C-alpha cells in the first residue's frame, strides 16, 4: 500500500519539479522555497557513493569545516588533563574532564554533541566506548577529534565542522546549513563538503564515484542534484 501524501507535502511537491535534476545553484534557491515548518529546518545533503564499505580502504570517513557553519549550536566535551584541559576550556569547550567525565557518561549524563580527546586519554575513552560508539560520539583521528591540538579541534567544531562517514550501503548524509541561510551560503557549504569527499575517493573505487545526490530540508521532499557537477568540484 502506498503511503498517503499529506496536504502539506502535496503543497510542497506542487512548488518544485521533483523529477528534474538540479544544478547546485538552482537547488540552493529552490530548497529554501520548501521551508514550511515552524522551526528553522536543517538543509541536508544525501550522497550515494560508488564504494563498498565492506573493504576497509573504501570506508569513507572524514570531517570538514563548512565556511558558513551548520547553524546549529554545538556542545563539545573534551577528555583532557592539565594544560590541555585548560586549553580546551579557554577555547570554549562546554565540558572538560577525565575520570570524572567518564563517570558522568557511565551514569547517562550525555549533554553534548561532539567528543574530543587528547591521544593520552584514549585508553580512558575506550572504557566508555560501548556508550559513545552507538551514539556516534566516539573520538576518531580521521575526524580530527583525537588530537593534541585541542584548541584547534574545539574551534573547528564550534565553527561548523561536520563529521561524515558512509553507511553500510555507501550513503553519506550531512547537514549543510539552515533554511534561513542565503542560497549562496548553502551552495558554498555543499561544495566544501563535496570537495572533501572527492579528495577522499579511494584508488580502488570502481565506476562512477557519486552515483546519486540530493538536497532537502528536515520536512521537505528532496531535489536531485547533478552528480557530475559535484564530482567535478575541486
UniProtKB/Swiss-Prot annotation:
Protein family (similarity comment): Belongs to the universal ribosomal protein uL1 family.
Subunit comment: Part of the 50S ribosomal subunit.
GO BP annotation list: regulation of translation; translation
GO cellular component, one term: cytosolic large ribosomal subunit
Function: Binds directly to 23S rRNA. The L1 stalk is quite mobile in the ribosome, and is involved in E site tRNA release.
Keywords: Repressor, Ribonucleoprotein, Ribosomal protein, RNA-binding, rRNA-binding, Translation regulation, tRNA-binding
GO MF annotations, alphabetized: rRNA binding; structural constituent of ribosome; tRNA binding
PANTHER family membership: 54S RIBOSOMAL PROTEIN L1, MITOCHONDRIAL (PTHR36427), LARGE RIBOSOMAL SUBUNIT PROTEIN UL1M (PTHR36427:SF3)
NCBIfam families hit by this protein: rplA_bact
UniProt xrefs under PROSITE patterns: RIBOSOMAL_L1 (PS01199)
Keyword Transcription regulation: no
Protein's gene: rplA
UniProt xrefs under InterPro entries: Ribosom_uL1_bac-type, Ribosomal_uL1, Ribosomal_uL1-like, Ribosomal_uL1/biogenesis, Ribosomal_uL1_3-a/b-sand, Ribosomal_uL1_CS
Coiled-coil residue spans: none
Name of the protein described by the UniProt record: Large ribosomal subunit protein uL1
Pfam families linked: Ribosomal_L1
Amino acid at each position: 500500500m502506498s503511503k498517503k501524501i499529506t496536504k502539506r507535502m502535496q503543497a510542497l511537491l506542487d512548488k518544485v519539479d521533483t523529477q528534474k535534476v538540479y544544478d547546485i545553484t538552482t537547488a540552493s534557491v529552490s530548497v529554501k522555497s520548501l521551508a514550511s515548518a515552524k522551526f528553522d529546518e536543517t538543509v541536508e545533503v544525501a550522497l550515494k557513493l560508488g564504494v563498498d564499505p565492506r573493504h576497509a580502504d573504501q570506508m569513507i570517513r572524514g570531517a570538514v569545516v563548512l565556511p558558513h557553519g551548520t547553524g546549529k549550536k554545538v556542545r563539545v566535551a573534551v577528555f583532557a588533563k592539565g594544560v590541555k584541559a585548560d586549553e580546551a576550556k579557554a577555547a570554549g569547550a562546554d565540558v572538560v574532564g577525565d575520570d570524572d567525565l567518564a563517570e558522568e557518561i557511565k551514569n547517562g549524563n550525555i549533554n553534548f554533541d561532539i567528543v574530543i580527546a587528547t591521544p593520552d586519554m584514549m585508553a580512558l575513552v575506550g572504557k566508555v566506548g560501548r556508550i559513545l560508539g552507538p551514539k556516534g560520539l566516539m573520538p576518531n583521528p580521521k575526524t580530527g577529534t583525537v588530537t593534541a591540538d585541542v584548541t584547534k579541534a574545539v574551534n573547528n567544531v564550534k565553527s561548523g565542522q561536520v563529521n561524515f562517514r558512509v553507511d553500510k550501503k555507501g550513503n553519506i548524509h550531512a547537514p549543510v546549513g539552515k533554511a534561513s541561510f542565503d542560497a549562496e551560503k548553502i551552495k558554498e557549504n555543499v561544495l566544501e563538503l563535496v570537495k572533501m569527499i572527492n579528495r577522499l575517493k579511494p584508488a580502488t573505487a570502481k565506476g562512477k564515484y557519486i552515483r546519486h545526490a540530493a538536497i532537502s530540508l528536515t520536512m521537505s521532499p528532496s531535489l536531485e542534484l547533478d552528480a557530475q557537477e559535484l564530482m567535478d568540484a575541486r
